Amino acid sequence: MLLRDVKPADLDAYVRMRCDPVMMSELGGPQPRERIAGQLRRDLETVREDSAWIKMVVAGDSAQVAGTVTLYPHEGISEIGWMVLPEFQGRGLAGEAVRQVLDLARADGRWGLIHAFPSTTNAASNAICRSAGFSLIGQEETTFAGRIFQTSHWVFDSSAHA
């Protein structure tokens, strides 16, 4: 598994991840396809500015994108999120990618407390939080892409895990 920064050629992967009803079922449903190119442009700019990390998860020795892990400032906190395409799920890629990003965050030193908000019904993502060393704070309503849903609120102190 390899992590790399998002690049312009990732538009198809963005569409596959964000417009698919199965992929987005735990995030309030699919996003409109016409918004995805703009999202990619904004993400590329954030990576250029180094204000967020948007890492594409590449499976094995192939160049095929399997998913993404993002770490970004959001409403005064550092937030991490991830998704893996259905055909790559169940291989441990998301867990490995999240742990690698947390290792990078520890070394970088600027992220402090890192929050994750998986849907309360997303057993796999909640298990990743647990196994990666996050502490469960509680449950709350979260808005993502204009949709409200119930999430588990996890926190990881990247400075305490140095």
Model segments located where?
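Conserved acetyl-CoA-binding loop-helix of GNAT-fold acetyltransferases
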Residues: 84, 90-105, 123-131
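Helix N-cap/coil-helix junction residues
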Residues: 93, 110-111, 134
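Conserved hydrophobic beta-strand within the GNAT/NAT acetyltransferase core sheet
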Residues: 114-118
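Positions that flank functional sites
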Residues: 121, 144
